[in-house]
Regions:
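Acceptor/aglycone-binding surface of glycosyltransferases and processive sugar-polymer synthases
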Residues: 70-72, 76-86, 100-184, 200-219
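Hydrophobic helical membrane-anchoring modules
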Residues: 1-5, 180-310
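Short, well-formed alpha-helical segments that are part of the catalytic scaffolds
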Residues: 18-33
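Short aromatic/hydrophobic "clamp" motif used to bind/position activated sugar donors
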Residues: 92
Length: 310
């Protein structure tokens, strides 16, 4: 009797200093995938951990594990990219190694890809922290990026998603040094379904996503997917030209009426205008500088990540 070959599924799991919970996370994933009729490969991407994360992963002695060791900490997006580049399966699922992405959703995500969706994007629904600073700043980020860019990113989306081989191959064609995967995947336009989920509490360790890293991710997203900052500069320039024309018209009116003697010296107002113009120029030059900096880093063609070889 002919048997139908099992579909191959790759799990991409970036980890960074997760020695406290990595065994628990793996055991929980295995408790789910051991019951599913698919062939799994688990790509753990060690993003330059300086604790025992790598040692503990090797001790798991699971033949399905493929450990990718990065030479240093390149960041979450780079680690995800390393796993995606290494993947070969028909279905690829990325999830975090901190235990907050529930593996119990894997079966539903795989089934949706099999039904024909190229991207199954999860959406974080956090009911227990309605007033947290992280939630408010995250909401502000999504509102800004969706107003400033033609690429729409659903609020609350995470890097917990399933993708078809077609979507992954398209994503791998996008060689961006400052890549923001949730924006790049939305940009591809492949058939997508949103799957809400309630994040689990961390079973140990602390979040590695500091305020600095969140701001860096937001900056990458804004400057990678929008030219609005440049248009803001053009608008300010136009406004200043209009104000300069209005001032010129006002001064000329005194000359026409022969009332130049009534014009005040106006040293303070002149300095005020000079300072405003100079400040705006510095801001706008800064915007241009950021874009040039991004171009500079792209044209150098440095790899997004480096893999350590044994």
């Amino acid at each position: 009797m002919n048997t139908i070959p099992k579909k191959n599924v790759d799990l991409i799991i970036p980890v960074y200093n997760e020695e406290e919970i990595i065994k628990h996370t793996h055991a929980r994933i295995c408790a789910v995938i051991d019951k599913l009729p698919y062939q799994f490969t688990l790509y753990y991407v060690n993003d330059g951990s300086n604790d025992r994360t790598s040692t503990l992963l090797n001790e798991l002695n699971d033949s399905r594990i493929n450990l990718i060791e990065l030479s240093r900490n390149f960041g979450h997006q780079a680690a995800l990219t390393a796993g995606i580049d290494a993947s070969k399966a028909e279905i690829i699922i990325s999830m975090d190694g901190d235990g907050q992405h529930p593996p119990e959703m894997l079966q539903e995500m795989i089934e949706l890809v099999i039904q024909g969706y190229d991207i199954v994007q999860t959406q974080r629904i956090d009911k227990y922290q309605p007033s947290s600073l992280k939630k408010k700043t995250s909401s502000l980020f999504y509102k800004l990026i969706n107003k400033m860019s033609n690429t729409k990113i659903v609020q609350g989306t995470a890097d917990f998603r399933a993708m078809s081989r077609q979507a992954v191959d398209a994503l791998k064609e996008m060689h961006e040094y400052h890549g923001v995967l949730r924006g790049m995947i939305a940009w591809t336009g492949f058939s997508t379904i949103i799957l809400p989920y309630q994040p689990d509490e961390r079973s140990g360790g602390v979040s590695k996503y500091s305020l600095r890293k969140m701001l860096s991710l937001a900056t990458d997203a804004i400057f990678s997917f929008s030219l609005v900052p440049l248009y803001i500069g053009l608008s300010f320039g136009g406004l200043l030209l209009f104000l300069a024309l209005a001032e010129l018209t006002y001064v000329l009116s005194f000359w026409i009426r022969g009332e130049t003697s009534t014009l005040a010296p106006g040293w303070s107002s002149l300095m005020f205008i000079i300072l405003i113009v100079a400040g705006l120029q510095m801001i706008l030059i800064g915007f241009i500088g950021v874009y040039i900096g991004y171009i500079f880093q792209e044209v150098k063609r440095r790899p997004v990540y480096l893999v350590k070889k044994d």
